[in-house]
């Protein structure tokens, strides 16, 4: 009997990670439908998986960045400027797509939702101030709180100071970096179990009925994100590399977007993205910096969410929006999206700031935010999948760009 069970198990283990994840998703849906009580219990697997990823991500980023910079020698190629340019262009284009889609498919909301909890930021100045303070955070505090801006700053500073270190010191640094990378690989191997728990728990807790009331709004948001992922981003990559972008696009969606969709955390997906960059044979000096930086500032999905929900509010209230103001919203949404990682509640709590451009009162804006929280199960998951997979996509595009 045990031999009979062992044979399918061995066959399952021989499958690649992506097929295993697909099986985990299917099993999660099945358990949630057939046995909801059990689905609530296995949600613990998902919580453990996310906690493990979040636990290993800060120390991984710190050691990889410090080691990469300490080992860097003059003349070695890096593409950080190119990656940053692609991040900015990608976020602006995503906001523009969202604005155009909102004009083509206007959405009306029933603003009768309960007040959302949380305190929105006062404006872009406050967001930039918070980012600046994060840069000079205490290094221990940055590691404890997963402040990746602060972690990057300290890792880059220490890495530059260690460039003149002895060979023995560099060997020790590389050994620590390799050890943490090995732990990350073990955690990622548990992704099918973790995603099985996340899918089962989410469907058992929320179901899909709550989403049906706001199906049109959700369709516009998800449609924009799919358009950005499958049309806009490939066009940007083609212009950068002059090659067919779709093999790279689909590799990033398979390797990054699936796990990001279910973890709903760009920070938790950093180890997954690092491993994907390694498989794509990208330069470690580039991706060890660009991936954690992208998890903080590359937020195309957030720009889509802010733009679509803000314009849905203006349409509901009968506020006319001219083209110039719409372009201003694109810029504001893009800048605000860069600060999403430092705001509790993410992109949704940045909506009042964007809504203030159109004279919408904070009370009404927070009711709109409450609607956003209703659809956040799908909206936040799709947003994170787009954000995180784009980090790898643009890093790869910059590394492969023709010069």
UniProtKB/Swiss-Prot annotation:
SUPFAM superfamilies in alphabetical order: Proton glutamate symport protein (SSF118215)
Localisation: Cell inner membrane
UniProt keyword Repressor present: no
Annotated GO MF terms: neutral L-amino acid:sodium symporter activity
InterPro entries registered for this protein in UniProt: Na-dicarboxylate_symporter, Na:dicarbo_symporter_sf, Ser_Thr_transp_SstT
Topological type in the membrane: Multi-pass membrane protein
One matching Pfam family: SDF
Domain of life: Bacteria
Recorded family membership: Belongs to the dicarboxylate/amino acid:cation symporter (DAACS) (TC 2.A.23) family.
Function, in words: Involved in the import of serine and threonine into the cell, with the concomitant import of sodium (symport system).
Descriptive protein name: Serine/threonine transporter SstT
Taxonomic source organism: Chromohalobacter salexigens (strain ATCC BAA-138 / DSM 3043 / CIP 106854 / NCIMB 13768 / 1H11)
